[in-house]
Amino acid sequence: RDLVRSRGLGDVYKRQVITVDDDLIYPRNTVERLLSLSYQYPDTVCGNVIRKIHMDGNSFSVYRKWTKVFTMPVNSSLQNVAIGCGGIYYPPHWYGEELFDWKIISEHCPSADDLWLKANELKRRVKVTGGGEFYPRPIELPQTQNNSLQKKNNGKTNLNDKQWKSLNELWKLDELYCINGK
């Protein structure tokens, strides 16, 4: 189950957490890779699959322009967005109370957990680490992707852009991103 939608996880603040999507079969080394990155880059969120935020001047570009990166030198940056389909490591103490604010979640970002988490990372200036050797895309379980969030968020409805715009208007994420650099 993912971190945001599982209620009652306030006690995870003091713990390391690894999230994976429950509709995928992951490579055997998924957790090992995440832990290895976390040892090298403590106090950062770590992901096996990364997108890079793309800007048009001082504004965020549309989500489809955020490049998905499967292979790159390991780096830690505010530009990196950890994508849940690769598994994500969260260090202890990385988030604030708003992470579990269901009123804000339901109003601004009800179905894009990766973006909700990224917005909270930007607010707290928490970098995301990713990269290294090629990480193969996990195998989709049959019949699980017909109505997946990924299709709704990235498909014709394009909910990712709508939800990111709403979060940006709420918290001025573009200003935080430009001020704090990449």
Residue ranges of predicted features:
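Short, hinge-like loop/turn segments at secondary-structure boundaries
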Residues: 11, 62-66, 147-149
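C-terminal catalytic/acceptor-binding lobe
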Residues: 103-182
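A residue-level structural signature of the nucleotidyltransferase/glycosyltransferase Rossmann-like core
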Residues: 17, 87, 109-110
